[in-house]
């Protein structure tokens, strides 16, 4: 089989795998819609007009001028509208599979020199380029400081692209968001005074010979959904014209229905929509008023431009209006892209949400769909908004993902248990020669920021796990990247230090964490020494969580074409991940392995084309 046929075979396999995943999620959407349809509602029975619905007790607080608000239509069948969205999701998967398969078949007759073939059109989405962390010399820069990050958007956008037959552009994957997409079986805190546990593990690295991998794991205490306390939620929904495709507004509405089914009478829900203009759809209805919420969502229709900045201001006004003392007050922004009308100064938006977070109102961002044509999905802006507003950024590409974020992990999404969480690790130059932080490139802090409580950092939610990985080289490693300086008395200094501080002579590093308890302005410090006795001899001796996190981080580094990874490939990572599946209660690890295999096929395919066509432009 010549290279062209191999390329086409690999492409076809990638499309088949992607289609199975997409259509499977769409079918679940369809089944979910059927289950949620009330038995008493006839298929031909029209729903009441919104003006009539607003007169009922369940919708008493809906605005009477709803029909004039941008993005609303007078739907006759609210539930049918949601079910139609499920059918459109399924139909879109079929159409995409058929269309892309036809392109592959028709390309089988193309000449070997015809290399303009691509799996999907170039899109205009905005992904910030990541400047990879370098290899640091412990004797020169022994301290590394960063803020934790619980965002997961980079994982699901990567999955979406791969399922469409594309590899992400190099240096656009935030590796920490891939790793933190998964939960790990870290021990829970042993007392209520400390909101999260801290544990470390040290084993050989799979990325390079004669190097080690240090894992730092945090786990927040868990809270049952019925023990969350009251929540004041404002759903800020994008209903602009670009939201009309099945993977955007229809999926968004089903996701919001999932969320609403988890709420109770003590919660407050408001809905603000924005397109060419902004408007209030629901104003502080009870969280268990499912009828009012479902009716309001069913009226939404995609039309007009995107005036997101005005919508955010209106949403925060409602959040302040219904503010719950000692409760969770949060705006949830759901959109497919950039704010392209009205005030569009992104830094001003970031500053605005940061100021609101100091008043106790957080912001979580949910992305839907990917841009095409003149539309653009602004991954970077959504991540920055959530980072500055004590929130989490997730990309919703399937109903399964909506359930994960808004149902399975609702406690972590809504309840923050510690904020401004910072990590600082000091490596011992007497033991460690070099180290490299994997990921967290846009969460790095200055050394002095660690003790400065005025410097903002990330939050951890109830039940959240946070993982960070360092690749390190010991002084006796035969794979050191940096030669020792000729004129520095490093060895004698280390020996003297060991004599003065014999209890630290065998320490690999000293881990420090700072966090602020909820409602507190002063941070608390916790410290942990990491000893070389923790070092495992072989990678297979490490825990499932360690090995799986290493496989996920390795995947992200391969996608970014990381310059510091020399001894791993897709085959090795697939084997490593498959050996570390653990319990995998929700099947997320199995899904990752399938995505890893698809990416491996795509990588082999693009290697057969010119180097400049290897990575899809974003």
Language model segments and positions:
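C-terminal motif of bacterial Sec signal peptides marking the signal peptidase cleavage site
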Residues: 21-24
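Charged, compositionally biased N-terminal leader segments and the immediate start
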Residues: 30-36, 50, 76-138
């Amino acid at each position: 089989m010549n290279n062209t046929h191999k390329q086409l075979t690999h492409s076809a396999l990638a499309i088949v795998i992607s289609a199975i995943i997409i259509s499977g999620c769409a079918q679940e959407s369809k089944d979910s819609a059927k289950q949620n349809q009330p038995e008493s509602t006839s298929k031909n029975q029209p729903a009441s007009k919104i003006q009539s619905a607003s007169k009922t007790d369940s919708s008493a607080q809906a605005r009477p001028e709803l029909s004039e608000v941008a993005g609303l239509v007078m739907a006759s069948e609210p539930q049918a509208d949601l079910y139609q969205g499920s059918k459109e999701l399924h139909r879109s998967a079929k159409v995409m599979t058929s269309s892309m398969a036809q392109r592959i078949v028709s390309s089988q007759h193309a000449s070997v020199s015809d290399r303009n073939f691509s799996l999907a059109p170039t899109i205009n989405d905005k992904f910030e380029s990541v400047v990879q962390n370098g290899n640091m010399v412990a004797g020169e820069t022994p301290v590394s400081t960063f803020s934790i990050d619980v965002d997961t958007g980079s994982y699901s956008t990567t999955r979406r692209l791969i399922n469409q037959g594309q590899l992400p552009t190099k240096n656009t994957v935030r590796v920490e968001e891939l790793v933190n997409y998964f939960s790990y079986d870290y021990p829970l805190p042993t007392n209520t005074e400390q909101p999260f546990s801290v544990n470390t593990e040290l084993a050989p690295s799979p990325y390079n010979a004669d190097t080690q991998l240090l894992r730092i794991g945090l786990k927040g205490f868990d809270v049952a959904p019925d023990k969350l306390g009251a929540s004041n939620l404002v759903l800020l929904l994008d209903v602009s014209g670009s939201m009309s495709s099945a993977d955007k507004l229809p999926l968004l509405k089903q996701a919001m229905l999932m969320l609403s089914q988890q709420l109770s009478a003590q919660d407050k829900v408001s809905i603000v929509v924005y397109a060419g203009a902004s408007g209030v759809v629901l104003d502080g209805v009870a969280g268990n008023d499912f009828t009012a919420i479902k009716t309001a969502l069913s009226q939404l229709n995609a039309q007009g431009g995107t005036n997101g900045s005005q919508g955010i201001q209106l949403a925060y006004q409602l959040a302040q209006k219904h503010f719950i003392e000692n409760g969770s007050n949060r705006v949830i922004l759901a959109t497919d892209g950039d704010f392209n009308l009205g005030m569009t100064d992104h830094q001003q938006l970031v500053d605005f949400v940061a100021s609101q977070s100091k008043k106790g109102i957080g912001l979580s961002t949910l992305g839907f769909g990917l841009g095409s044509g003149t539309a653009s999905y602004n991954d970077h802006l959504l991540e920055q908004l959530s980072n500055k507003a004590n929130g989490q950024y997730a990309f919703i590409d399937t109903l399964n993902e909506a359930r994960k974020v808004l149902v399975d992990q609702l406690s972590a999404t809504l309840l923050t248990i510690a904020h401004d969480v910072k990590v600082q690790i000091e490596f011992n130059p007497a033991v460690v020669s070099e180290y490299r932080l994997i990921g967290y490139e846009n969460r790095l802090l200055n050394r002095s920021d660690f003790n400065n409580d005025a410097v903002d950092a990330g939050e951890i939610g109830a039940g959240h796990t946070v993982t960070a990985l360092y690749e390190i080289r010991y002084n006796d490693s035969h794979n050191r990247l940096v030669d020792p300086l000729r004129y520095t008395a490093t060895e004698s200094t280390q020996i003297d230090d060991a004599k003065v501080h014999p209890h630290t002579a065998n320490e690999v590093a000293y881990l420090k964490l700072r966090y602020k308890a909820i409602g507190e302005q002063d941070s608390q410090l916790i410290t942990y020494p990491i000893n070389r006795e923790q070092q495992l001899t072989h990678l297979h001796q490490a825990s499932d969580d360690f090995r799986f996190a290493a496989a996920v981080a390795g995947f992200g580094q391969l996608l970014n074409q990381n310059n510091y990874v020399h001894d791993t490939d897709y085959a090795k990572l697939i084997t490593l991940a498959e050996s570390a599946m653990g319990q995998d209660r929700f099947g997320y690890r199995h899904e990752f392995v399938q995505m890893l295999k698809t990416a491996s096929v795509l990588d082999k395919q693009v290697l057969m084309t010119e180097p400049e066509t290897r990575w899809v432009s974003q």
